[in-house]
Amino acid sequence: MSSGVERDARSLPWYRQVDADQWRAFWATFLGWVLDGFDFTILTFILIDIQESFTIDRALAGALGTVTLLMRLVGGAAAGTAADRWGRRLPLMLSILWFSLFAGLSGFSTSYAMLFAFRALFGIGMGGEWAAGMPLVLEHWPVHLRGIASGLLQGGYSWGFILSSVVFTFVYPVLTPYGELAWRTMFWLGIGPALLVLWIRKRVPESPVWLERQRHLKETRRPDGVSLLRIFRRDLLPTTIQCSVLIGSFMFSYYSITFWYATFLRERGQTTLSYLVALNVGGILGSYVWGRASEGRPGRRGAATVAALIGVGMVPLYLYATSPGLLFLGALLMGFFGAGMWGVVPTYLSERFPTSARGVGAGFSYHAGAALGSLTPFVVGAFQDRGWALPDAMATCIVGALLLSTGMLWLGPETRGRRLLALDGE
């Protein structure tokens, strides 16, 4: 009987197979990730202003991005451990409040050192939001729709980038006559996401998989056993290492594509909005397409590999096109392939770890990868300080990281179709 009901459900469009609680869990994490993306990417538009305000070189400006990515590891590990022990919702809410606070405080910085500290603290909240939110959604959604959920969720970061692009284009120019107030206001807008917490607290349910595990532990009087050290034990250590290096290569490629792109466009004399929208619309569409493709024959690894290799081929069009039309096309296609391959990441990482370590395992691996990739803004900036043209520095990093990504994907198992059970791995 249950199989017949399942077949009837699958005959519906996929979005009608998702119930209200599952959608609320999705929107909570998705909107948090959109706003997280806005708060991080707005920095890329105002690096030149920050250089001028604090009289720093490009390497130090890039280090503001680097320290944020490094500190995401702290947030991912802490919130992931908390999510496995106390549930997914509470760490998600606290992480959103945390990154909103320090995004806003960044606008009050009176020195480079103060701004550096605030961006480091912002990174902790940014890491926590992903670590708690992704398991919340993927443990709610049906197993056969997890790839779609993954792609839609990860595309939220691109929506955040579009939002920061629009705000910079239309709000920033109004404030430029007021000097430093312009770039400081871009940071102050980042406090807005804190309002999302009120809705999450009232409307978003806890993960049913996590709740089932807690019921079982209570009935059997077993200790919880949740610990950061769990992912470094013999059974999970290879998974933790492979996933961390994999995400590091993904991060290095993504930030090579995006972090200095607004500066690249300004140096080319182009208005940034249309190209950044193209890049991120490509990322949104690509995340959905490759996430959905990962549910089919290619699997998680195959879908991401195809996207990455085609992304390598898009580099000349993305960085060296001579006409605005071709430059626009390059942005769209690089987004679709080079950024779109991220659509498989949330579900792949969630499927690699058991429920007892899913938050901390996926969160730590994702943000350990971010820490490895955190060198990207600094490296690209350092190449320029040594005489490299910005397109050459970006291209070298993009190609190298995408090729490394394809190799790392195949060092781990295929996970498509793996069920997320309350007691898996115990």
Regions found by a protein language model. Name each.
Residues G299-V345:
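C-terminal transmembrane helical hairpin of 12-TM major facilitator-type secondary transporters
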Residues V74-T110:
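Conserved MFS/SLC helix-loop-helix module at the cytosolic interface between two early adjacent transmembrane helices
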Residues T55, G87, F108-M114, P142, ...:
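Helix-breaking motifs and short loop linkers at transmembrane-helix boundaries and internal kinks
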Residues R85-S95, G296-A308:
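Cytoplasmic membrane-interface "Motif A"-like loop-to-helix N-cap segments
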Residues T44, D235-I284:
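Extracytoplasmic gate region of multi-pass secondary transporters
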Residues G76-G87, S287-G299:
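Helix-to-loop junctions at the C-terminal end of transmembrane segments
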Residues M1-F38:
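Cytosolic juxtamembrane N-terminal segment immediately preceding the first transmembrane helix
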Residues G147-Y172, P193, Y366-P377:
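Glycine-rich segments within core transmembrane alpha-helices of 12-TM secondary carriers
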